Amino acid sequence: MTDSHTIETLGPGDEDRIAQVCALLVSSFRELSPAWVPTTEAAREVVAEALEPGMFSRVLLVGGRVAGWVGARHEYGSLWELHPLVVDPALRGHGYGRALVEDIERLVAGAGGLTLLASTSDESNRTSLYGQDLFRDPLGALRDLKIFDRLHPLGFWQRLGYTLVGVVPDAEGPGKPSIELAKRVGPRATFRE
């Protein structure tokens, strides 16, 4: 990382930082997932959900300004979901996304989590899954998955050690799947051969 940064908990009373996170969400997802947070009001709903009790919500600050945000929630058993993750597009490539993910992985493991689930969608023809009827052969489509645009986050997740574990057809609309990845963050178990 080229700039000094800090990662801190985002709380419900951090209004200035919440406003910065909302602006970051709207601007960052405009191309990759335009229907998800199209307005500041929609972004505020996402942030409010991530600030509920039992959730982890962390901001990465560069020069005192929000440069990224990550959240995680307990799903059930030892499974947690990382959602969302956003880094200012002008600051990508500096290791900030990795730093946020590693911070959340540490917190989840500390809370007893073993597996961390992350999802990424394809709503804009950036992978070979877009526009396909994935109900026909979802596992075959995953096996043959290709990334057409290096800006799609799938490669980022794989570089951080996340494994493809599934696909949810039409999750974001017809032909717009959710790609599911997971990583073991807790202690490794002993498995049968």
Where are these regions (language model features)?
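Active-site rim helix/loop that mediates acceptor-substrate recognition in acyltransferases
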Residues: 22, 26, 30-61, 71
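C-terminal/domain-terminus segments
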Residues: 70, 84, 166-193
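Conserved acetyl-CoA pyrophosphate-binding loop and the N-cap/start of the following alpha-helix
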Residues: 91-103
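Conserved GNAT acetyl-CoA-binding A-motif
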Residues: 108-149
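Conserved active-site tyrosine of GNAT-family acetyltransferases
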Residues: 157, 162
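Conserved acetyl-CoA binding element of GNAT-fold acetyltransferases
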Residues: 78-89, 119-121
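A short beta-loop-alpha structural element at the N-terminal edge
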Residues: 4-21
